[in-house]
Amino acid sequence: MKSLMMNKLLFLQRITDSPSTTIISTFIVTIISIVFLYTVLLIRTTKNKQKIAAPKASGAWPFIGHLKLFMKQDTQFYRTLGTMSDKYGSVFTLRLGNQAILVVSNWEMVKECFTTNDKSFSNRPSTLSTKYMLNDTNSVVFSPYGTYWREMRKILVQKLLISNQRSEALKNLKTKEIDNSFVKLNDLCNNDVSGGGTKVRMDEWLADMMFNIIARITFGYQSGGGDAPGASTTSKNVERYKKTLDEMFVVLATRFAVSDIFPSLEFIDRLRGLVKDMKILGDELNSIAGCFIEEHRQKRRESLSSLLSLSNESVGDEQDFIDVLLSIMDQSRLPGDDPDFIIKIMILEAFAGGTDSLSATLTWVLSLLLNHPNVLKRAREEIDRHVENGKQVEVSDIPKLGYIDAIIKETMRLYPVGALSERYTTEECEVGRFNVPAGTRLLVNIWKIHRDPSVWENPSDFQPERFLCSDKVGVDLYGQNYELIPFGAGRRVCPAIVSSLQTMHYALARLIQGYEMKSASLDGKVNMEEMIAMSCHKMSPLEVIISPREPRRS
C-alpha cells in the first residue's frame, strides 16, 4: 500500500516537472488573466457609456469658446440662450474660455439641480467684482457653502428678517419710508398748474424709494429728517453711499473682466485699471458703512452714560440692522475674524440685493399696467372694494388684494430681473440623464423657464388672471414651484422674499389707489424694450403723467 502511494506521488511529480505541463499551466494563467482584464475593461466601458454628456453647442472658437455670445449687442444673452435651448434641448453645454457651462432651461431639470443635487450646486462662482467689491469670502451671498455661510445665513434670516419681532419692526420701518416717498410724490404733483398732471420719471422715483427703504432698515436713515441732531452729517454719508453704489452698478454693467473668463489673466485687468477701480469703490463703501457703525456705537455709549437700558436705545420698531448686529456682538460674536467688516458686508448686500431688483420690478409692473389699462382698472376696483371709502390702503389689507398679487407674479414671470441664475458644481453629479463633472458652472435660464409654452398658456402675454382661475392658482414665488422662480431656489434662494413682496405689494397698492396715471409718450404706449445685459432691465426711462386721484364717491 505504501509503495503504491509512493508510485503515484512520483508519477505526479514527473508530470508536473515535464515541459508540456509548464506550457499548459502558463497558457491557462494567460487565458484567465485576459478574461479578467477584458471583464474589467468591459465594466469600465459600460460605466462610462452610462455617463452621457449633455449636448454641446456648436460654434465655439479656439481659446475663447462661446465668448462671442456674451458680447452680442443686438439681443439679450438670456434670449440667445433661449433660442439655443430650442435647438439643442433644455439641457446643453457651452464653453467660456476653458470653463464648461451647463445651461438648464427646463423647470423639472432645475428642480433636480436644487433638490437632489442641491448640495452639489450650493456654491456661486467667484468673479473679479465679487472678489474686490463684494468680498466674496465673507459674503452671505457669495461665500463658499460651509459652516461660516450657514452661521451667517442663520443670523440674517432669524435675527434680521424672519422672527416675529423683526418682521413687525421691518414692516413699520418700510411703511414709514414709503409714506415719506408718497409725500414727495404729492409735492411733485402740487407743482402742476395746468391741471393736466405732472410728468414724473417714475423709474427714478421708485429707485429713490427703494434706496431710502433699505437705508432706513439698515442704518436708520430717515429721508426728510433734516431737523434731527447730526442729520446733516448722516445725510451726506447717505448721499456718498448712494453715489458710490450707483458707480458700482455701472462698473458691474459696463466693465468686462478678462479674468472672469481666464482667471490666470487677472494681470490684464490690473493693467487696465479695473482692479484698482473696484478696490476703490469697495473701500469707499466699507469706509462709509464704518461711519454708520461708529455713529451707532456712539449712541450706545450715550445711552449707557444716561443710565438708559441698552436694549431700548432704539425703541421697539426703530431698531435697524446695525443695532441688531451690535447687540449680537455684545451677547456673543459674529462669525469671522473682523465683526465690523462682517456688518459692512451685510449692509452692502442689503443694498445690492434690495434696491435695484425691487425698483426694476416695480418699473416693469407700472409699465405693463399703463399698457394694459383694463388690468389697471380692475386692480383699482379691487382696492376700492376691499378698502373702506376715504381710507388709505394699509399693509394689513394686502392679503385681501389677490389681483395685485397676481399682477406682481405675472410681471416677475415675464420680466425676472435676475433672468439668469449662476452656480457651480463642487462634485460630480447627474442632471437628468447627463453627467456633470465637478467644477462645471451652472446657468439657469429663468427667463426661458418662465416662458415655456408647455407650462404657460400664451406665455408671452400679460395675463394676471392665470394665477386666479387656472392650474396656476397655487403657484407662489417662494422657490418651491420651479416653473416660477424669480427669487431663485435651493439653499441659495433669496432670504428676503417675504419682506420684498410685502414692500412691492404695499407700494403698488398705494400708487394704484391714490393716483391717475398714463404714459407720457406721444402714442400713449410705454416702450417695453429690454436692456442688452445679463439681467432684465427696462431700456428707456419710464415717464408718466401722474395726478392725485379724486376721492371716490360713496
From Swiss-Prot:
Question: Which pathway does it take part in?
Answer: Alkaloid biosynthesis
**Which cofactor does this sequence's record say it needs?**
heme
Chain sites annotated for binding heme: C494
A Pfam entry, by short name? p450
Q: Which UniProt keywords apply?
A: Alkaloid metabolism, Heme, Iron, Membrane, Metal-binding, Monooxygenase, Oxidoreductase, Transmembrane, Transmembrane helix
- Enzyme Commission number, as recorded: 1.14.14.163
Function, as annotated, reads: Cytochrome P450 involved in the biosynthesis of the benzylisoquinoline alkaloid noscapine. Converts (S)-1-hydroxy-N-methylcanadine to (13S,14R)-1,13-dihydroxy-N-methylcanadine.
What protein is this chain from? Answer: (S)-1-hydroxy-N-methylcanadine 13-hydroxylase CYP82X2
Organism of origin is Papaver somniferum (Opium poppy)
